Structure formats: C-alpha cells, structure tokens
C-alpha cells in the first residue's frame, strides 16, 4: 500500500502521455471545438471510464484488464484481450522510448545523441518494470508530477498575465484547420487530442494503482480525479496553443517546437527547462508502466507469482527483446 497522494501522483503520470500536451496543441488547430471536447470528454467520458476500470479491478482483487473482461464476457474474449493488450503495451512502451530520447537529445550536447538517450531510457524502463512500485516509481513519480503540474500552472498564470486575445467559444466553433477539407473535426480532432479527453490505455493502468489502495473511498480522488487533472492540463495547453497559432499562423506542425517556444517566451530559461522536463516525464512515465502492465498481464495468464526476480525475468526478457526489435526495425 502507498499513501493516497502518492497513488494519485503515480496514476496521473501513468495516464498522462503526450495527449494532454502534444495532442491538445494539435487539437487546438480545429478551433474552440477542442475546448468543448476536452471539458465534456474528460468529465463525462474519460474520468468515468478510468473510475470504472479502477473500481472494477479494486473489487476483484486488483485483477488486470483482460482478467476483468474474462470474468464478465467469457474465456474466449479474455484470451483475445490478453494477446491484444500485451502487444499494445509493448508497442506503447517502444514508442515512448524514442520520443523522450529525441527530446532529451535536443536539450543536451551533440555527444549525447538520440541513441545514447534511447539506451538510458530503455535501461530505466527495465529497472522500473522489474522492481516493486515503491522502489523507483513511488520515489521519482511525485517529482515528475510536480514538474508537469508546475508547467501547466505556469502556463495558466502567464495566460492571465499576458491576457492574449482568444476566440469566443461559439465564434470559433468551426473547423479552423488550414486543411479542413481533408481533416474533419470528427474523427481527426478526437484522435489528435487522444488521452487529453479519453483513452482506453488508461484501463490498463488503473489496475496497477488498485493494487496499492486500501479503501474504495480513494477511488474517486485517484481514478476520477487524475483524469480531471489531465483534462485541465490539456485545456491549458489548448488555450496556449490557440494564442501561438493566432500570433504565428498555423503552419507549424511540430508540437515540440510549439512547446519550446511557449515555455521559453513565457516561463524564461529556468521555467522552460522545468516545463520541458515535465513534457519528457509524461511519455516516460507512461512507457515504463506500459511494460509493467504487460508483465503483470502475462504473469496472470501464466499463473506465475512475481515475488522473485528470477520469475520476473522469465517474462521481461522476451518482452524487452521484442521491444528492442521494434526499435531497430
């Protein structure tokens, strides 16, 4: 068991990938419809989804997603979901190795290139997947969460200080994307914002925290509250991106460039570094828990206890070899 505040921080980082930042920025190109989807989507869809996923796991002894599905939909569906979820988790983990490594390489000297950071991030993933939650994740996640929240609060404060001109919700309720004919609001905007409003990936992460909880009373602040917090972060970045597009046009398609420009102009050098650390922390903390989820799902499937390091390695070695193969490919 972990303290509730720490469980909240870990859950928040587990579910907050690049969606509430990069996704919200790209979603802002579609106009103020992105604001409405982030608000209503996170409240009535994303948070409800995460809460149900977490509470179902909590009431069934911390079972992982495929086991819960099998309990209610039968053995065949469970077997399909086991395979699908493990493959999905390995793919997510592999994607969230290359992305953060590229961001770190852009902040460090040329000698520390992307390949170097890929190795560093991957070694961290191996350790975070193998060791118990309280050994690494429980210690560093709160620091990552503080960096991510500092970034969001800092941008929010500067929105009020700079008081940029933003379109009224109803005036901007049209597709403002430069390529609107090829990129309709539905479904492209929803896919772009992704976990800034709702994500099925979260259903694989909530059971991890359900195993660390001691009371159902903690379910609402942890599962529901973490998604609402993610929605707030997404809304802040959507507003900041709207200002950026208003001042600089919509030609820029690299969300990382937009993040860098906004944070350096509004938060200064030190604030910009902390903000970028928050951006890097978001995918890293989703990647390591993706691998961890895959390990626990396979362990449930094989009925293999995970107290000994040797048994963890039986599962992790093939899984990480598959991820390395994807990265090399």
Where are these regions (language model features)?
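Membrane-interface "cap" regions at the ends of multi-pass membrane proteins
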Residues: 1-21, 188, 212-218
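Loop-to-transmembrane helix boundary motifs in multi-pass membrane proteins
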Residues: 75-79, 114-119, 225-234, 242, ...
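Membrane-helix boundary/coupling elements in multi-pass transport proteins
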Residues: 18-25, 43, 61, 88-101, ...
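Extracellular/periplasmic helix-exit of transmembrane alpha-helices
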Residues: 160-170, 224-261
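Membrane-water interface regions at transmembrane-helix termini and the short interhelical loops
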Residues: 29, 56, 67, 96-108, ...
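Helix-loop-helix junctions that connect adjacent transmembrane segments
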Residues: 142-145, 151-203
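Flexible loop linkers connecting adjacent transmembrane helices
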Residues: 1-2, 26, 32, 48-77, ...
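Hydrophobic alpha-helical segments and their helix-loop junctions in multi-pass secondary transporters
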Residues: 93-119, 125-129, 148-176
